[in-house]
Amino acid sequence: MNQKGRGLEILINEKQDGQWLFSVLKTALKASKPVIQDWMSHQQIKVNHESVLNNMIVKKGDRVFIDLQESEASSVIPEYGELDILFEDNHMLIINKPAGIATHPNEDGQTGTLANLIAYHYQINGETCKVRHVHRLDQDTSGAIVFAKHRLAHAILDQQLEKKTLKRTYTAIAEGKLRTKKGTINSPIGRDRSHPTRRRVSPGGQTAVTHFKVMASNAKERLSLVELELETGRTHQIRVHLASLGHPLTGDSLYGGGSKLLNRQALHANKVQAVHPITDELIVAEAPFPADMKNLCRTYFS
């Protein structure tokens, strides 16, 4: 399989000779049947330079080209803004999101979100793809977040997220001293019926697993610098799990954290690790701390 611009070309080999095109694409690209059918309906697949609209038998020596560039209408309004790009190619984008900005709009016409800035970035670079986030970050959480540029990349990265091979590492400043230096919090999370946005540990909630390691502590100020890795991705997962241990994040007023040091939860997604959806290369993107977290670390954990 070779990359050609924003597409892929497969030269049918002896092993693939006589196979159905769907089978070849599913095996070679990990593409689902709906994705392949969508490519065909939009004339994005060509065999020997001829558009293919239906499944067919391929022969050794056939050249199958898949155009991954998609021309799709999007409800996200492009809006200019600076982006801190950690990684980008024709298939995926990783951004260091600042705190205070939502990942995506919650309603048509909304602006001021990260997705709006990415839509503008795509527009000025001649890319006609939708803004597809692979995972989310809370509005007041900073750090690395992954976007896919086409359906295939999104499907593969989403599968990695489901299989827990897309790794997300966070750094948090929690209140108090944790009892153990490292461990795993395995507590289901559900909605808090007494509050419209808050979550809580609940026996009837969804499975939620967080691994943690204390990197440093400050006994005088009763603060802990904690590195965390998500095995699942529930809303507010780290915030809920640490609060359930009696160690809310500093600045996280929703879950009982004090706000004298920071006016937002002290949580930063410092690293994401994923297998590239097309090349199978291991992509590791590290997001530098924003100024507020950097200053706290320098002051209390230097």
Swiss-Prot record:
<dbReference type="Pfam" id="PF01479">
    <property type="entry name" value="S4"/>
</dbReference>
<dbReference type="GO" id="GO:0009982">
    <property type="term" value="F:pseudouridine synthase activity"/>
</dbReference>
<dbReference type="InterPro" id="IPR006145">
    <property type="entry name" value="PsdUridine_synth_RsuA/RluA"/>
</dbReference>
<keyword id="KW-0694">RNA-binding</keyword>
<dbReference type="GO" id="GO:0003723">
    <property type="term" value="F:RNA binding"/>
</dbReference>
<feature type="domain" description="S4 RNA-binding">
    <location>
        <begin position="19"/>
        <end position="90"/>
    </location>
</feature>
<dbReference type="Pfam" id="PF00849">
    <property type="entry name" value="PseudoU_synth_2"/>
</dbReference>
<dbReference type="InterPro" id="IPR020103">
    <property type="entry name" value="PsdUridine_synth_cat_dom_sf"/>
</dbReference>
<protein>
    <recommendedName>
        <fullName>Uncharacterized RNA pseudouridine synthase YhcT</fullName>
        <ecNumber>5.4.99.-</ecNumber>
    </recommendedName>
</protein>
<feature type="region of interest" description="Disordered">
    <location>
        <begin position="182"/>
        <end position="205"/>
    </location>
</feature>
<feature type="active site">
    <location>
        <position position="138"/>
    </location>
</feature>
<keyword id="KW-0413">Isomerase</keyword>
<dbReference type="InterPro" id="IPR006225">
    <property type="entry name" value="PsdUridine_synth_RluC/D"/>
</dbReference>
<dbReference type="GO" id="GO:0120159">
    <property type="term" value="F:rRNA pseudouridine synthase activity"/>
</dbReference>
<comment type="similarity">
    <text>Belongs to the pseudouridine synthase RluA family.</text>
</comment>
<dbReference type="GO" id="GO:0000455">
    <property type="term" value="P:enzyme-directed rRNA pseudouridine synthesis"/>
</dbReference>
<dbReference type="InterPro" id="IPR002942">
    <property type="entry name" value="S4_RNA-bd"/>
</dbReference>
<dbReference type="InterPro" id="IPR006224">
    <property type="entry name" value="PsdUridine_synth_RluA-like_CS"/>
</dbReference>
<dbReference type="InterPro" id="IPR050188">
    <property type="entry name" value="RluA_PseudoU_synthase"/>
</dbReference>
